[in-house]
Amino acid sequence: MKIKLALEWFINPDHLPFIVGLDKGLYKKNNIDLEIIEPEGHYDGFKELAQNNIQLATNEPLHLIEKYQNNICSIGNFFETNGGIIFTIKGYENLVNGKEIKITSPVSNPITDKIANDIIQRHLKKINKTNKNIKIVANDFYHIKHLKAGFDAAWLCFENFEGVESKLEGLEVKKLYLEDVEIPNFCAL
């Protein structure tokens, strides 16, 4: 049986169950010919599912609400981590000092932008600060590259990926994660 699986992101450690299954021949042993498709855009899998071009897609639970369609259903999670927004140290200082903040994200729309803003505003309230000068810019998937290029923060970051990558790149960061501001975790696939 041929199964096409569209990812939400480029292949990375989040996708280990699929990578290991292919590497160990587990799918072939069960007569499954799995094709993994890396997207150009974060929502490509939803479009391909809706058009019946693929059988499965991965994406974060919040996008299932955002991109709801009658012919698409969630069959479960295979992965969960902490996550939220990662700031450069300078970006975080700008945030608490009320300066303009530019945040890179793979998507920018009213739903995801509101969640990012909620994280920031809840954090600022806890430390008795305010800042409404926040701009979210849609870019590609490479958060750490954008932080190193001058963005103040990156949104929709996962600890197991961008959290680790920032350490490996020697980038000093301040993390504002969902759990820090009492928002239920949705950093899962």
Where are these regions (language model features)?
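Short, glycine-/small- and polar/acidic-enriched structural segments
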Residues: 2-138, 148, 153-160, 175-176
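Pocket-lining segment of extracytoplasmic ligand-binding domains
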Residues: 61, 142-143, 151-189
